[in-house]
Amino acid sequence: KEEALEKEPLLPETILNGAGYYAEYRTDDARLTIEVLKTALDYDAKMINYTEATEFIYEENRVIGANVKDSISGDEFAIKAKYVVNACGPWVDELRQINNSKIGKRLHLTKGVHLVVAHEKLPVKQSVYFDVPDGRMMFAIPRGKVTYFGTTDTNYQKDKNTVETNLVDATYLISAVNNMFPDINISLDDVQSSWAGLRPLIYEEGKSASELSRKDEIFVSETELISIAGGKLTGYRKMAERIVDLVAKKYNRRFDKEFEDIKTKEIVLSGGAFKNSSEVKSYTDAIQNRIAEVDFTRIDAEYLVHNYGKQTDIILQKFDDIMHDNMQEKMIKAEVWFAINYEMATNPTDFFMRRTGRLFFNSESVHQFKNFVLSEFKTAFSWDIKTTENHQKELKHYIKMATTFE
């Protein structure tokens, strides 16, 4: 008990018997996805962003590609392939439906919600994993100036493109945290932002959302569309390995070509060439010293390193080259440049939500710099007034989704 309180003084002493201490994963799912894609580019992969598959192309009753539509320009074109893998998460069944192969097992979507408050409102020293009155488990995780906590696990059957946190979700999470930390007393007004995601689980008869297995499964249709669903983010490399091995075997049988074994566990993601945590700290120290001269803090250094890894050097080089009096805007300008030129960002929502996480973890900066960032994108892509207004409305919509509950 004493050791637990030393590591986390916020734990309720009167009911505390003890605690376990273990290593756990923490990541930013959008940043992880981007870095995986960028690393794949180094191995001759081709990337297409904002493109929707509308129908499959068949030859001799085999899927050999897809007709797709550019969501920005409206252009339509075909992509050919020896094999097609459907790894679309919550949308896996939609593509199976297009392929007329949505039979047997199907997805069961559940929603997970997270709330974000100022760190001083929930000042945990480190991540805490705890149970709540209904028997579920929750976590609270410090990140920079904020702490986020969650998550819920409820059935979901609405629009997959607009997954919102509602008042019931927010009230449940706040009540659970206040129950665990009675002296905190968080209210709805303390919530700075929120986000919600979907778990693409495999349906099992008679099981509740929390009871459904998180195991991934592979489905191969009669036309050889290969689909994968279920699983957890922490196992994404193992899931990818299973799919790639399956495709390689099929390819070898059909086209008589063998592939060398690829040891993906030895591949370091772009920007992440750190040997250990002490090396991360040393690099962060160096970045802090570099930006302290222009009034940035330790939290700013940690934000850059946690988001971009050693790619921070690229951003700071651009920062040094930019002629701009306001240092905060100058740094944002360098980040926007990096997002556009290195990460295929096409609009302010991409930047604030999917490339930097500012919408969730630093919502104040979104309000502060939204017009400046909009102007940067307008200049970069030569937008007309209507296009600029549309992207302004889109960002406003996502800000409302993250900061209000109905």
Which residues does each PLM region occupy?
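Short, hydrophobic/aromatic-rich segments at coil-to-beta transitions
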Residues: 62-66, 124-126
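Glycine-rich beta-alpha-beta "Rossmann" dinucleotide-binding loop(s) and their flanking helix/strand
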Residues: 40, 95-113
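Short beta-strand segments that buttress and anchor functional surface loops
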Residues: 21-22, 66-70
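A conserved short coil-to-beta-strand element within the FAD-binding core of flavoproteins
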Residues: 49-64
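Aromatic/hydrophobic pocket-lining residues that form π-stacking "cages" and hydrophobic walls in ligand
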Residues: 36
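Well-ordered beta-strand positions in beta-sheet-rich domains
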Residues: 76-80, 114, 266
